[in-house]
């Protein structure tokens, strides 16, 4: 029977000490269809973009052995190295990370790359930072067009791009078939509560531009490490809207915070979200 949707697991939900084989095996065991790999701000993860052929081969062998693909990639390193940073050296590093991440995605069979919607993370957003951000995002779209990889803006925590509507503006300015939006259910919920607008109306502004959805729990003003179904995200309502807008790829975003039963949390995230997704399917 044809699957109606796919659900992926955020890599950082698992213990960092696990091998690729163990991570992929864990995701499969907990009921996922794919894994989302992370290129985060740590040197260890950023260095993945310089992987040699043998290392890539090892990952691909793990993928085939587990029977579970790496379906997407989150490039959160672009917080520390922001695309709109006033420092030219930081912007160059950001562009290197972006380009090499997209090239790595090609080599690993990853088709969707998520970039954070920040012009600058550490520092003040200005006309200048917004200008640099747009310039570099246009370059990223050209790289994505060349490599055939879909890139999506993640809606983030701060005012610059914390709603789908704001992401749409940049997608329209760049106007590329390969640059779309990868919203975060938790972040757009927090923005909706703070700014008193309807989260599903905001999500609907992205119609035709949504490539996947991060399913993440939040509380007002708290954006990370909130256990599933203990916060204020209306998953049923958001999934229902996302489904009606054609979203068929979902990733549960949660973190290993050192708990002994971290694996149970992953299985719970899968089961609770699949229950809602299966109602749509």
Task: Describe every region a protein language model picked out.
Residues 87-108, 112, 133-147:
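An active-site-proximal structural segment forming one wall of the substrate-binding cleft
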Residues 1-106, 176, 180, 197, ...:
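N-terminal pre-domain/capping segments
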